Design a protein with these regions (language model features):
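Catalytic PLP-binding core of fold-type I/II PLP enzymes
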Residues: 1-24
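Short coil/turn connectors at secondary-structure junctions
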Residues: 4-7, 25-27, 41-44, 182
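Conserved active-site segment immediately N-terminal to the catalytic lysine
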Residues: 10, 24-35
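Short His-Asn-centered micro-motif
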Residues: 11-13, 33-34, 165, 174
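Short, solvent-exposed amphipathic alpha-helical segments in soluble enzyme
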Residues: 25, 48-49, 164-168
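Conserved hydrophobic/aromatic beta-strand scaffold that supports enzyme active sites
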Residues: 29, 44-48, 148-150
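Active-site C-terminal subdomain of aminotransferase-like
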Residues: 35-125
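Conserved C-terminal alpha-helix-loop-beta "cap" of PLP-dependent enzymes
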Residues: 129, 133-186
């Protein structure tokens, strides 16, 4: 990429892939798991790699440096050239990913998906800012995710009870980040 002075530029897009516009010329390795925007389970890793990133993985492989097979990019590259994976992913992961990609492509591709994510996140954050008992977890609008929105609730409102009601009505995966211990939904 321009301005990288030969250094590889890697982008961890796990929470963004499929919900933000992408210019592959600006990174050497854009990698993600197909959860979030792709409506799939974790456990599968995907990457768009430049020739420079592939060459670096091959250079490491022939250097004799020990890398566990699970982390060896050259194995992933070799398998991808054979349309295979090193470990067999759950079939549901592949089906969910394929269905989501079909839906995205049918509606206009990545531009559609990014626009839809932007619109949805704007609605969520605008609602949270205007409502007396909610606030966006990330207060700086420039730093907020357009793919995963997290909303704090006033302490006298039980966010876990809201999540339970949402789940009973078919809206799933809204539970808060447990490690934060906050009264929130995402």
């Amino acid at each position: 990429p321009k301005g990288s002075d030969g250094a590889l530029v890697l982008v961890d897009a796990t929470s963004a892939a499929g919900g933000l516009d992408l210019d592959t010329s600006q990174s050497d390795c854009y990698y993600f798991a197909p959860q979030k925007s792709f409506a799939s389970d974790g456990g599968l890793w995907m990457a768009i790699m430049s020739p420079a990133a592939i060459a670096r993985a091959e250079k490491i492989k022939v250097s004799g440096r020990w890398v566990p097979a699970f982390f060896d990019l050259s194995i992933a590259i070799e398998n991808s050239r054979l349309d295979q994976t090193y470990n067999t992913p759950a079939l549901a992961t592949i089906i969910l990913l394929a269905e989501q990609l079909n839906w995205m492509n049918k509606n206009g591709g990545l531009k559609f998906a990014a626009s839809r994510s932007e619109d949805s996140s704007n609605r969520l954050y605008n609602w949270a800012e205007k409502t007396s008992y909610t606030t966006p977890f990330v207060t700086d609008p420039a730093m907020r995710s357009k793919v995963v929105g997290t909303i704090n609730f006033d302490e006298n409102i039980d966010a876990l009870e809201i999540a339970k009601i949402l789940r009973a009505n078919g809206i799933v995966d809204t539970d808060p980040y447990r490690k934060l211990g906050k009264n929130q939904l995402r």
